[in-house]
């Protein structure tokens, strides 16, 4: 459908403290505070983990983010798992929050983010995490992040082709696991600054690329 839904951005590891005005590492309480704002805003429809808390062990940070999400909002959410073990635990959390396994399948509000390694690679861990989600019948969000001029060709058409190939390859695996399982077509392209070697996430070309990829998503 031609409808636009918005989510917040993630995953910040530093924040400007509203009390002191200083830049500092993010903590778990920041996730709670940000989610309260997201939950209250009618123009933000989906919650994406906003920060990577630096005051908890890095191995369990994803679990802490999931806990915050399930405790402080009833909006749809995108989660990221750090391991297959965590993926299974997050699915259990989602089932409890939904009122049971069948209720979660009937009305899933939890999708799991997985990224490819452009061009044309996916990590073993990402594959295993996504397959667990597909087996549970929950949506997977395949987020492809081509970098025009670096991990994808400098041309628009070439970058879109690489992006699409990354997505289709990953989704083919998931459809083999559970045919017809919902998959979100994700795009977060950036552009290579050839002079400074930086990734530009707000260059004009980025929006052209993402618009083209949005059109590709409608094709499927």
Segments and roles (model prediction):
Residues 3, 8-43:
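A generic, well-ordered mixed alpha/beta core segment in the N-terminal half of proteins
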Residues 1-4, 20-21, 92, 120-123:
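Proteins with a high burden of low-complexity, intrinsically disordered sequence enriched in S/T/G/P/A and R
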Residues 26-220:
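Helix-rich catalytic cores of soluble enzyme domains
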């Amino acid at each position: 459908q031609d409808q636009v839904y918005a989510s917040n951005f993630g995953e910040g590891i530093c924040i400007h403290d509203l009390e002191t005005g200083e830049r500092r590492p993010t903590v778990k309480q920041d996730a709670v505070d940000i989610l309260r704002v997201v939950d209250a805003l009618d123009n933000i429809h989906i919650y994406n983990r906003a920060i990577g808390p630096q005051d908890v062990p890095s191995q369990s940070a994803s679990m802490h983010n999931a806990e915050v999400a399930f405790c402080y909002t009833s909006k749809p959410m995108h989660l990221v798992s750090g391991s297959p073990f965590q993926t299974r635990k997050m699915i259990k959390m989602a089932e409890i929050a939904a009122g049971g396994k069948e209720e979660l399948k009937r009305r899933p509000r939890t999708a799991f983010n997985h990224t490819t390694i452009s061009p044309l690679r996916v990590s073993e861990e990402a594959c295993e995490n996504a397959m667990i989600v597909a087996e549970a019948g929950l949506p997977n969000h395949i987020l492809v992040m081509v970098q025009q001029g670096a991990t994808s060709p400098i041309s628009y058409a070439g970058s879109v082709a690489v992006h699409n190939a990354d997505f289709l390859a990953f989704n083919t695996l998931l459809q083999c696991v559970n045919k017809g399982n919902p998959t979100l077509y994700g795009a977060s392209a950036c552009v290579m600054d050839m002079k400074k070697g930086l990734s530009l996430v707000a260059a004009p070309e980025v929006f052209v690329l993402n618009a083209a990829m949005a059109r590709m998503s409608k094709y499927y």
